[in-house]
Every structure is written in C-alpha cells, then in structure tokens.
C-alpha cells in the first residue's frame, strides 16, 4: 500500500507506530491473512488502526469491491479498531463500481481524498472524519506544519474539482483501456485484467531506456520499480 511504501516511514518517525502490511493480491486484501494478523499475542505490538487503500496504486489502480471493504470493516469493528481509507483516487473507484463516492467511504472512521489527481485541482486533499475528531485533526495539522494562510483561491479550485472532476473520470478509464489494448496488440507485457481505472502498468526489460524513448517522442510516463506506469487524465487528447 502507498501508506506503507511511500511515506518515508512517517508513521514510525512521527507517531512511533509500526505499520504491518497484509497480503493483498490484485489490490484486494487477503481476508484470511488479515484475520490472522489481527490475532495478537501478549508479546506483539497492539493494533490501533486498520487502513485500506482504494483504488490500489501498486496493483495497477485496481478497485477493492465494496463487499470486501465491508468485511474488512466488520473484522475491525469486532475488535474495537478504527478504520482509515486511503482514498486518494476514491472517485475513480466510485465510477468503476457505479456508485456515489460516499458509498466507497461509508463505514470508515476516517478517509482521505486527493483533489489533484483525476479530479484536476492544482493541489490539495481532504480528510473526511466525524465531527468529534475535527478539533484533534486540526491540532495535528497545525503541529505538523500543514496549516495554510490565504488558501481561499486554491480552496475554490478544490470545490470546482469536486463538482466537475468526477464527470471526466469515465473517459480517463476508457483511455487507459484503449492504451492497454493497444500495447497488448504490439506484443508488450501488459495485464489487461488489471486495468480497471486510469492506470496501465507495463513490464519491460529496461524501464529507464523505455522511458527515455517515450520522452524523445513527447510521451511522459513513470517508473515504479521494474515497471513503467501510464496514467490517463483529462488533459490528454483522444
């Protein structure tokens, strides 16, 4: 999960928390492995939070089904644990599932949504939480240097992104599917079954050389480990 792989060990550094990943083949948590991980003995660190990512970046932008989310929430609830949804691309999941965005976030104690990915805002994200946690969240935001001044202009862009951005996501998904199918027809190693939203991962022998070739042709993509990642978005032409 992004929370585990890409945040510089921040949970340990800032909160003294140990993050324990659970297998999630195809981005879907292995419920049996999760249930086993939740069984803690007297010599193991206690669990304080269960976090889930949807859509799942490293799995190729795949979507966790709502029934799987509900099962994860049930497991946490049975043990008195709060839950957090890393929903940076929550609206992509909602479009794929054919539901309102609120349905993807439903049942979690807290959730995060990015405004600057598929929704198209220049910057920003939202923390969704119950009213009783708001004061504490604002205190920690200030403590960690996250307070802004004169943020109204960017907030206006964020509101517009929330209102207008979701309309464009289905097209993003369709472009990703078309791209994946085109790469597959060229004989390149792409898993068509993993293309559910707006990401396409490509297995190549020389990722850096491949990316240089793309840049020479005016195409920008990224490298994730030994793979090349394409992300489709509203600023691309058909």
List where the protein language model places each region.
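Conserved PLP-enzyme active-site core in the AAT-like
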Residues: 1-217, 221-236
């Amino acid at each position: 999960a992004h929370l585990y792989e890409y945040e510089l060990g921040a949970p340990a550094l800032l909160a003294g928390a140990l993050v324990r990943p659970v297998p999630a083949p195809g981005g879907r948590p292995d419920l049996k492995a999760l249930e086993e991980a939740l069984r803690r003995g007297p010599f193991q660190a206690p669990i304080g939070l269960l976090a889930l990512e949807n859509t799942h970046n490293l799995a190729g932008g795949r979507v966790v089904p709502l029934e799987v989310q509900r099962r994860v929430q049930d497991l946490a609830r049975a043990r008195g644990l709060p839950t957090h949804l890393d929903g940076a691309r929550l609206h992509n999941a909602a479009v794929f599932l054919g539901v309102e965005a609120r349905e993807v976030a439903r049942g979690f104690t807290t959730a995060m949504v990015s405004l600057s990915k598929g929704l198209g805002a220049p910057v920003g994200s939202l923390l969704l939480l119950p009213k009783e946690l708001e004061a504490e969240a604002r205190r920690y935001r200030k403590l960690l240097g996250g307070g802004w001044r004169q943020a109204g202009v960017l907030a206006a862009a964020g509101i517009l992104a929330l209102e207008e951005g979701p309309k464009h996501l289905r097209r993003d998904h369709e472009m990703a599917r078309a791209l994946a199918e085109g790469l597959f027809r060229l004989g390149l190693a792409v898993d068509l079954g993993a293309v559910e939203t707006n990401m396409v991962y490509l297995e190549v022998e020389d990722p850096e050389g491949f990316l240089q070739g793309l840049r020479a042709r005016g195409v920008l993509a990224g490298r994730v480990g030994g793979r090349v990642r394409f992300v489709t978005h509203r600023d691309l032409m058909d």
